[in-house]
Amino acid sequence: MLRKAGVHMTVSSLTDYSSLVREIGGECAFVRVSGELLVSGSKSGEVACWDLSSGKEMWRSRFEGPCSNADSNKDFLFFTESDRVHAIMLSSGDEAWCVELEGSSDLVRVSSECVWVTSSVYNFEIQDYSEGSVWKIDYSGKVRWRGDTIGRAWSLSDFQGKAIMGLSRPKCGYAIASETGIEYLELEEKKPITAGCKLDGGGIVFGHSNGSVTEIYGGVSSTVSLGDSAIRSMDCGSSWVVGLDSGVVSTGKSLGSWKIESFESIDVVSFGPSLDDVAGIWYSSWNDKGGIFLVDSSIGSLQLELSHESRIVACFATEHTICFGDISGCIHVIEKEVLRRRFGRLPETDIESGRESELRKKIRALRGA
């Protein structure tokens, strides 16, 4: 069943529901939460860290840029930047190590024993990525293994100590990398992979350029077609949710395989906190102005719509918190308890007054003083 979203509700702003707003210099490239710390990096090369409870800036560093992707564990932030991958101590912002790669650094994922990183080379003659590499780096910063890939990896997941990569042209399909080499596997769906993630139960999910989704469990794959445009964004938990270039948001079979149609291409989609005990799904789209939507994951019913003046380009969520980074460099944090409390006070039929909005801005500023 296809539903329309965002056509009947009076809309509050993202700022109205944000318990913390901070800035990173330039367009946001990534945002993450690690424990009680909020970290973000920008296309211009800035990386900063704030304490979530107080809002205080803990540290800020500047790199050449652009930053592109990040992952973390309890001690370190790992992020790709230009042709390098960095390991930064979360507690201090000090750099533990930096490894220079070949080509542009792309994706990074942390495993129990190493850090997997992908890089690629763009061929201007064919207007596509012709070469790629995958790197296995230990926690001391030593490169343990490197392998060349046919084309660029558009998704990267850690699975049982190996790297799982979703590939675009010319190979398509996916690859499994380990120190013994790279194994290429074909899928029933032959179109390029545009997104991918790992399910909590260990399965791997890939989104394709034609709107199909392939789910792999125990070496057995199944494919479903959701539309005729590319999968643009994807998130995984116990099930999966995807956003299409056409504006469709859809879920996996265990969540009912429902669909919602937004007004424009989906920029980000993520599981996150909700207004009730059922997990929420958040997604954003853009059409001269931004729309951020919260829906019930079980049936796809719209719970909340927020406006934002700048395009959302990055997102990260935990059970209790969701963070959005926009193209202007602003980071907005929504916490579950604050979300529920303000929803009760800010009904969709009553937009917050200018005076109340300014007061909230002052409170957020004091939180970081």
Give residue spans per PLM region:
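Hydrophobic beta-strand positions that form the internal "hydrophobic ladder"
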Residues: 38, 77, 115, 163, ...
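Short, solvent-exposed loop/turn segments at conserved positions within beta-propeller repeat blades
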Residues: 79-80, 124-131, 168-170, 285-290
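Repeated scaffold domains used in trafficking and secretory/extracellular systems
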Residues: 26-32, 64-74, 102-112, 149-160, ...
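Loop/turn-rich, solvent-exposed surfaces of beta-rich toroidal or solenoidal domains
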Residues: 260-295
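A short helix->beta-strand "capping" segment at the edge of beta-propeller domains
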Residues: 2-26, 53-56
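A short beta-strand motif characteristic of beta-propeller blades
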Residues: 16-23, 56-61, 94-99, 141-147, ...
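Blade-level signature of beta-propeller repeat domains, shared across WD40, Kelch, NHL, RCC1
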Residues: 308-369
